[in-house]
A protein has these predicted regions:
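Solenoid-like repeat scaffolds
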Residues: 14-15, 48-55, 69-73, 85-92, ...
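Generic helix N-cap/helix-start motif at coil->alpha-helix transitions
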Residues: 18-26, 55-64, 76-77, 91-97, ...
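Helix-turn-helix repeat elements of alpha-solenoid scaffolds
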Residues: 21, 33-43, 71-80, 338-350, ...
Length: 433
């Protein structure tokens, strides 16, 4: 009905609509996920649904994730072509989820894909597309960060930073005087002695580079009923989701709410945003209201935060941030889903996409090959970095002394001393001391 007799009746109808919508989306995800191979008619139906102007972008993004998850179980050329088509969508969230699915499908099923000329032709076209090359480079770095670095960061949090914080018996946060202007000298001495500042600064730098520094924090917050549904691990964060809508303080743009901040934040992935909200809902309402009052407490602080929200909203639309959040969502699913042992964990694999024929042209592009090699070099993946530096020298940079020197250093580190000397000599020939 368009007219409601009471506000309570209206809320009841809205809740029922949200529930029906959620059920329909979940059923769509599950139907796609467990499907084997699409028939021509099923493929056509999927394309019609994806191109419909009546379907919300959030729902379509869940559909794209379902196709990707299905492909990771069994190869289907029609589903792969669906992802290739989905990548052309103008919405950033959709095309970034699609390219992640394309990359993973090529990684696991390259030999199968090469048997289909139409698919090969489409990939070759993309490999010459500047935007695709840039997007794929970001996906590659983010997959490497998740598969190779997140576990190290998690270990550092559990074994170094958190235990160090717990060592200080005087760190009584409940006894803090918010109005005190002076710093506690005992705390400052402990901070200097413990080296905690350096560790936190290192984590901050890792976060700025796109590393997943919140896995350790949020891994304990995936026990809520919400996460029992497999599709929910791939939900884009939506403040109107039925169970968290009550946290909203309305649509007043002049107000700063916790949901506004979460919605625009590029720091937390979608899964962690839901975890945060469900944790908030377990708090007494008085504490939630107090947090809200603190956000809106001081006018100057509020204005500054509003500006920050604008900046976050703009950066949120950038493909790099969208794909990073999605990769983090994938990582949490494969590491934390209650039935994760029934499926293959993709993040236990090397995920070296650049070694795949279908993707190497884009990832070894002259504008990105050195960036990829530098990433591997700085993260001590020396053998792979050395191979890429060699490839870069061979293809584009035979007169680049710095690359010869970096490659020489790598061969020295891994014990190939004769080769290292040859590379150092070549570097000296190009730029003699």
């Amino acid at each position: 009905p368009l007219i409601y007799t009471t506000e309570a009746k209206r809320n009841e109808e809205m809740d029922a609509m949200r529930k029906r919508h959620e059920t329909a989306v979940d059923e769509l995800f599950e139907k796609i996920w467990v499907s084997t191979r699409w028939s021509e008619s099923e493929y056509a139906e999927a394309q019609i649904l994806f191109n419909s102007l009546l379907i919300q972008v959030n729902d379509l993004s869940i559909m794209v994730s379902a196709v990707t998850m299905s492909l990771l179980q069994i190869f289907d050329i029609r589903k792969f072509m669906f992802l290739l088509n989905a990548y052309t969508h103008q919405d950033t969230m959709l095309n970034q989820r699609a390219i992640a699915g394309i990359a993973l499908t090529c990684y696991y099923y390259e030999k199968r894909i090469l048997q289909y000329p139409e698919a090969v032709s489409r990939i070759n076209e993309l490999n010459e597309n500047t935007e695709f090359i840039k997007n794929l480079h970001h996906i590659q770095i983010q997959l490497l960060q998740s598969s190779r670095e997140t576990r190290k960061i998690d270990k550092k949090m559990r074994e170094e930073i958190i235990p160090e914080m717990m060592k200080n018996p005087k760190l009584n946060l409940e006894g803090l005087d918010e109005d005190a202007e002076d710093h506690n000298p005992e705390w400052e001495e402990w901070i200097d002695r413990s080296g905690i500042t350096d560790k936190l600064r290192e984590l901050g730098e890792l976060q700025m580079s796109g590393a997943d520094v919140y896995m350790s924090t949020f891994s304990q917050l995936k026990q809520f009923p919400f996460f029992r549904k497999i599709s929910h691990w791939f939900y884009p964060f939506d403040p109107q989701y039925q169970d968290i809508a009550k946290l909203s303080l309305g649509n007043d743009e002049q107000k700063i709410s916790l949901l506004n901040i979460l919605m625009n934040s590029d720091v937390f992935c979608n899964s962690d945003k839901y975890s945060f909200c469900f944790t908030m809902l377990q708090m007494p309402e008085s504490q939630r209201n107090l947090m809200q009052q603190q956000l809106n407490g001081q006018h100057e602080a509020s204005e500054e935060l509003k500006e920050r929200l604008k900046e976050m909203s703009q950066s949120k639309a950038r493909a790099e941030f969208v794909s990073r959040q999605y990769i983090h969502d994938l990582y949490r699913f494969f590491k934390l889903w209650s039935r994760r042992h029934e499926i293959h964990d993709i993040f236990e694999d090397t995920l070296d996409l650049w070694n795949k024929e279908t993707l190497s042209q884009a990832l070894l592009h002259k504008d990105y090959i050195n960036k990829l090699a530098d990433y591997l070099f700085t993260h001590d993946d020396l053998t792979e970095a050395g191979i890429l530096y060699d490839k870069s020298i061979e293809l584009y940079n035979r007169k680049n002394a710095e690359l010869w020197q970096k490659a020489g250093f790598i061969y020295q580190k891994i014990g190939s001393y004769k080769k290292a000397i040859d590379y150092y000599l070549q570097s000296d020939l190009l730029i003699p001391d």
